[in-house]
Design a protein with these regions (language model features):
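Short, well-ordered coil/turn segments that N-cap beta-strands
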Residues: 2-3, 29-31, 63-69, 86-88, ...
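Active-site mouth loops of central-metabolism enzymes
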Residues: 3-20, 43-49, 67-73, 93-94, ...
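Conserved, mostly hydrophobic/aromatic
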Residues: 8, 25, 33, 82, ...
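Catalytic cores of alpha/beta
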Residues: 15-20, 76-85, 126-134
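Charged helix-capping and loop-helix junction motifs
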Residues: 48-56, 161-168
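Catalytic beta/alpha-barrel core
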Residues: 48-50, 67-79, 88-102, 115-127, ...
Length: 181
């Protein structure tokens, strides 16, 4: 069985950028487009995403190209409007995964919704925090879960922006055997 490929821009910046990217991805066999609509930033006055105005762009791609669409959600409002615009799946970002209150809010807002929810590892290498996010979602009845390993931030300069620390996703897979990673 072919692995599910999800691809797209980190940030949706314009309708044209998103549609051009989606067209190229579809022509290369990608079935799911991902695009960040809201971008949590460390410091103020940085690009924080286009917000809700980008959701119709994704919806248009879904209708015109037949691709599945997904975006990151960080709170109940994001979930509500993402679902309103027909997201086929959502993901919880690394910063949100690190906040149990945010994960709980998202989990509660997804109760009764039957779409996949992917969870990025937290920014810091804490497997219990990552597992806790899955537990919160599962306890709210969300069963279509998957993990995204993006690596972990480091204070020091390193070869990679995010250090893989492979032992953590390997341990996650050992502890939650049927979890897609």
């Amino acid at each position: 069985e072919r692995p599910l490929m999800i691809a797209g821009p980190c940030s949706a910046e314009s309708e044209e950028q998103l549609f051009n990217t989606a067209t190229k991805l579809k022509n290369n066999g990608i079935e799911v487009l991902r695009a960040g609509i809201w971008k949590p930033r460390t410091r103020p006055n940085c690009f924080e995403g286009v917000g809700v105005k980008g959701l119709p762009w994704l919806q248009n791609i879904q209708k015109e190209l037949g691709m599945k669409i997904s975006t990151e959600v960080a709170n109940a409002h994001h979930v509500e409007v993402a679902l309103k615009y027909g997201m086929n799946m959502v993901w919880i970002g690394a910063r949100s995964t690190a906040n149990p209150f945010a994960v709980q809010e998202i989990a509660e807002s997804l109760k009764g919704v039957d779409i996949p929810v992917l969870v990025k590892n937290p920014v810091n290498p804490d497997i219990e925090l990552w597992i806790g996010a899955f537990e919160r979602l599962y306890l709210c009845g969300i069963t279509k879960l998957g993990a995204i390993h993006r690596g972990f931030s480091s204070y020091n300069s390193t070869r990679y922006r995010n250090m893989p620390q492979w032992q953590i996703p390997i341990e996650l897979k050992r502890r939650i055997k049927n979890l897609p990673l």
